[in-house]
Amino acid sequence: MNLIPTVIETTNRGERAYDIYSRLLKDRIIMLGSQIDDNVANSIVSQLLFLQAQDAEKDIYLYINSPGGSVTAGFAIYDTIQHIKPDVQTICIGMAASMGSFLLAAGAKGKRFALPNAEVMIHQPLGGAQGQATEIEIAANHILKTRAKLNQILAERTGQSIEKIEQDTDRDNFLSAEEAKDYGLVDQVMVPES
């Protein structure tokens, strides 16, 4: 069963059927609506690069409803957002958790949004290790370095002190849209259009 809707567009040249994501891409909208893994990251990065090649001046809109996922895959998206010329507006719909919240904060300053009932969750990276003691030590050191890097970037993106970020990400920390705004993860809570 195909759960991806199809949109039929009629022009003077005839009809064309698009899957909904391809149609949204024409309007510079990218949807991140799943766990972040390498395949999702490659898809998002490809779309960002494609939209930059089409028009390096127009904003790109990244809608996020994600429980998070792989840190390295998330960094691929984050670095691309920072690298490309167009501003990337980030919009939280539903939930932006873990790496999803990190990408929400990655949007262009002043252009990071959350819908009124959206939730944001920040925490420290998760990981596991097994094997010999030295292998466990290597893995532990790596995750500590990763945590420090994530905390440093979150501090820069939110305006919070590194100490506050470390304290607030020690455990799962759930924020409402308004709380995410006060924290600096988003710049504005979107109100319904009238």
From Swiss-Prot:
It catalyses: Hydrolysis of proteins to small peptides in the presence of ATP and magnesium. alpha-casein is the usual test substrate. In the absence of ATP, only oligopeptides shorter than five residues are hydrolyzed (such as succinyl-Leu-Tyr-|-NHMec, and Leu-Tyr-Leu-|-Tyr-Trp, in which cleavage of the -Tyr-|-Leu- and -Tyr-|-Trp bonds also occurs). Cleaves peptides in various proteins in a process that requires ATP hydrolysis. Has a chymotrypsin-like activity. Plays a major role in the degradation of misfolded proteins. InterPro entries: ClpP, ClpP/crotonase-like_dom_sf, ClpP/TepA, ClpP_His_AS, ClpP_Ser_AS. Its EC number is 3.4.21.92. Fourteen ClpP subunits assemble into 2 heptameric rings which stack back to back to give a disk-like structure with a central cavity, resembling the structure of eukaryotic proteasomes. The lineage of its organism: Bacteria, Bacillati, Bacillota, Bacilli, Bacillales. It comes from the Bacteria. It is an enzyme of class 3 (hydrolase). Keywords: Cytoplasm, Hydrolase, Protease, Serine protease. This is ATP-dependent Clp protease proteolytic subunit. One of its GO terms (molecular function) is ATPase binding. The gene is clpP. Belongs to the peptidase S14 family. One of its GO terms (cellular component) is cytoplasm. GO terms for biological process: protein quality control for misfolded or incompletely synthesized proteins.
